Amino acid sequence: MDPLSWLYARQGRFAPGLERIRALLARLGHPEEAYPVALVGGTNGKGTTARTLAAILEEAGFRVGLYTSPHLVDFRERIQVQGRPIPEEKLLALLAELRPHAERLEASFFEAATALALLHFAREGVEFAVLEVGLGGRLDATNATEPVLSVVTNVGHDHLEVLGPTLQAVAREEAGIFRGGVPALAAAPAPVPANPAATP
């Protein structure tokens, strides 16, 4: 099985938790510690917000890695440095390096893809990485990083069956990317508890 087909075959293995992604990053030498990270979550608009933030950082002179999902045509769209998708030869080489560790840890598609992006950014010497949260926030693979900025675009009714059953429950999950003492931005027009992380 070719490397990309192997990665796609890991779809459907979703099981909430950060244990696998943290163990995978440890096996890879903690690439996520090589640069500052901004996490962008929310129900809608997080991809656009992540791309805009990456463009602002690039304009300011930073070498920027951008990780988004899903892709439109090509998987390589998800992992970009300076607006350019990861080259195919580098993608295949990193997948071959990642594969034995991901298999041993039974990592999911998104966990493996996230680790792949973080490793690529470290190898490419990025000065800042912008990561779009996949689903929710608290238990999302991107949340295995320690962000210097966390953004939640909004809190909506999408994915109530997974993150719900209420907007307050969704807000708690999305607020999971916030850290004490770390700048946080939120633009949530829907009613949200003032401190969703503390709501019973």
Residues of each region from the PLM?
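Charged, amphipathic alpha-helical linker segments immediately N-terminal to NTP-binding catalytic cores
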Residues: 1-14
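Residue-level signal for inorganic ion chemistry
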Residues: 7, 43, 64, 130, ...
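Redox-cofactor binding/interface segments in oxidoreductases and associated redox assembly factors
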Residues: 9-12, 26, 131, 152, ...
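ATP-dependent carboxylate-amine ligase catalytic core
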Residues: 14, 18-34, 59-145, 157, ...
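Walker A (P-loop) ATP-phosphate-binding motif of ABC ATPase nucleotide-binding domains
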Residues: 37
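A conserved segment at the C-terminal end of the G1
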Residues: 40, 48-65
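Conserved catalytic-core segment of NTP-binding enzymes
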Residues: 134-139, 146-200
